Swiss-Prot record:
NCBIfam families: hutG (TIGR01227)
Organism: Legionella pneumophila (strain Lens)
PANTHER family noted in UniProt: ARGINASE/AGMATINASE, FORMIMIDOYLGLUTAMASE
Record pathway: Amino-acid degradation; L-histidine degradation into L-glutamate; L-glutamate from N-formimidoyl-L-glutamate (hydrolase route): step 1/1
EC number annotated for this UniProt entry: 3.5.3.8
Cofactors: Mn(2+)
Record protein name field: Formimidoylglutamase
Reaction catalysis annotation: N-formimidoyl-L-glutamate + H2O = formamide + L-glutamate
Length: 319
């Protein structure tokens, strides 16, 4: 399957284990399916595809703390145990890995799989890996969804300096998307939720302003009402047909998400972002989503991994 993609690895069924406490298929490990041939995705039976991006090359290039390449499998392991409250069809399609700093190759191959799945009517729920997943994911979507906006829940803008031809990293994905949009003469629709004042330099705030980025600071989420926050999102998505939703786990406070490269002492609580995430899903405009930056070696008692799985489970159960 995907034999022409050297960095693709098929799913590992051993990750999907859990408690069998009823005769019914009530947990994710009992719902998950696997395929042997990509042609099995060319059907009218539409599925939600789990796809991992096992890379922390972008984090290493960004001088961060590595370990996120182990994130996808750990998220799958934790998701497997959770109750599943819907009858959707789920497929674990495996991972795209990154070895020997071949980040651009891995991003290209990940994008090809995303494009193939969406072209055949499926939805992607992807697990990182570093936030370099965002540039890979966007590349797979952009040609299929012309009026596509990006909403990123993140402590950082990830708009670090980037010029075409340079090597990207976990801090440049949205600069890469902006450059791509400029080349294609497309509007750059980018919204960042949970921005930390001391997680971004003044020049990054200036760049966000120059690129007309919509954003809410972490302080905004503490101080403003939920109705005000939803009105802000409404304003951003009003003229968009589709949304690519990406979640960087470092948007959350370190007590909830210690297992990330850049933990945030003043980060958000899960229930500050969950209503906004659910609202976006309920808008019907989200076509693809991912969750990034889980680093199992940096985690404490699986807190971050379990939280990542719970966030995914909540969103998959939102209609």
């Amino acid at each position: 399957m995907f034999d022409d993609l050297s960095n693709y690895r098929p799913a590992n069924p051993a990750l999907w284990q859990g408690r069998k406490d009823t005769a019914n298929q009530e947990r994710f490990f009992q719902k998950i399916t696997f395929i042997d041939n990509q042609n099995e995705l060319m059907t009218k039976d539409k599925k939600t595809i789990f796809l991992g991006f096992a890379s922390d090359a972008g984090i290493k290039r960004n001088l961060g703390r590595t370990g996120a390449k182990l994130g996808p499998d750990q998220i799958k392991t934790q998701l497997a145990k959770l109750p599943c409250h819907n009858n959707k069809h789920y497929v674990d399609l495996g991972n795209v890995i990154c070895e020997n700093d071949e980040l651009e190759l891995s991003q290209s191959q990940f994008a090809q799989i995303v494009h193939f799945c969406h072209e055949n009517g499926h939805q992607i729920c992807a697990f990182g890996g570093g936030h370099e997943i965002a540039w890979a994911h966007y590349q797979g979507l952009s040609s299929l969804y012309p009026k596509l906006g990006v909403i990123n829940f993140d402590a950082h803008f990830d708009l670090r300096p980037y010029k075409k031809g340079e090597l990207g990293n976990s801090g440049t994905p949205f600069s890469q998307i902006a450059t791509y949009c400029e080349e294609k003469k497309m509007p750059f629709h980018y919204c960042c939720i949970g921005v930390q004042k001391f997680g971004n330099t003044p020049s990054l705030f200036e760049k966000a302003k120059k690129l007309n980025v919509s954003y809410l600071s972490a302080e905004d989420l503490y101080e403003q009402s939920q109705a005000w926050q939803i009105a802000f999102l409404d304003d951003f998505i009003l003229n968009l047909d589709h949304i690519y939703l990406t979640i960087c786990l470092d948007v959350l406070a370190e007590c909830y998400a210690p297992g990330v490269s850049a933990p945030q002492a003043l980060g958000l609580s899960p229930w500050q972002i969950m209503p906004l995430l659910k609202y976006l899903i309920q808008s019907g405009k989200v076509v693809s989503l991912d969750i990034a930056e889980l680093s199992p070696p940096l985690d404490s008692e699986l807190k971050t991994a379990r939280l990542a799985a719970l966030i995914i489970a909540e969103l998959l159960d939102t209609n």
